[in-house]
Regions:
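Extended, histidine- and acidic-residue-enriched regions that form the cofactor-binding/catalytic faces
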Residues: 1-106, 110-235
Length: 235
């Protein structure tokens, strides 16, 4: 169920519902994938999990599409907010969700800029919400090899997920893009704070030409498994 598509009486009649909140960013994802890739993935996870869960009833909140976006700021289309703004929005929305009678709030994020992740971890803890932390080792090890290597921004991993849910948004140029292996965690540890200095002059790394909708669907199943497991453990 999508909250924005329900009527007020329909929400009032829900029994012990939980809320899922997709979070992402507006930032470049190569010359081939949409700016809203991270948000699209988070929405896909939440909607699949909500459909799979019968009890408790799960409601998907409208996505928070803006995030802390500095790495891609030199490219057209990047629109970001500060850590303070993100933290404040999470606290406000979480308080409102609680006031509306939702039992728990689950935050689902697929924008992994370190400041975004750190802010969401802190805000979720402050708000009493649950944050599905996909970059924690126990979760990351369940995902694809490209994701585990950290060379996955708009690469095979993310492009496959977009192909699974919105293939019309992936430019056919993806098929001709050369692989660009960049160890993003190592680059971050070395103090590089933007795509250009990391060696991503077209705002992507990994191998988008190897992406497929089939892989995307399989990855969505794994991502959804993790979210459903968290809900069942904590709701």
């Amino acid at each position: 169920m999508r909250l924005a598509e329900l009527t007020s009486p329909q929400v009032e009649n829900l029994v012990n519902p939980i809320a899922m909140w997709p979070v992402g960013a507006v930032e470049p994802h190569g010359p081939h994938a949409p700016l809203g890739t991270d948000t699209l993935i988070s929405v896909g996870m939440c909607e699949r999990a909500a459909a799979r869960l019968g009890d408790p009833p799960a409601v998907v909140l409208p996505a928070l599409a803006f995030g802390v976006t500095r790495y891609g700021a030199a490219f057209a289309g990047a629109i970001g907010i500060t850590e303070a703004t993100l933290h404040a929005v999470v606290l406000d929305v979480a308080a409102s969700v609680q006031q509306q009678g939702f039992r728990r709030l689950f935050i689902v994020n697929n924008h992994f800029e370190p400041e975004q992740v750190a802010t969401l971890r802190a805000a979720a803890a402050d708000a009493g919400a649950l944050y599905l932390d996909l970059v924690r080792r126990r979760n990351a090890q369940r995902l694809t090899d490209e994701f585990r290597r950290g060379s996955c921004h708009a690469g095979r991993y993310e492009t496959s997920l977009v192909l699974a849910d919105a293939p019309q948004l992936v430019d056919s140029a993806a098929a001709d893009l050369p692989a660009n292996e960049v160890d993003m965690p190592a680059a971050m540890a070395a103090g590089r704070t933007d795509f250009l200095t990391m060696g991503m002059d077209r705002a992507y790394c990994g191998a988008p030409a190897e992406a497929s909708a089939e892989e995307g669907r399989a990855t969505f199943e794994t991502l959804t498994d993790m979210l459903v497991e968290l809900v069942r453990a904590e709701a």
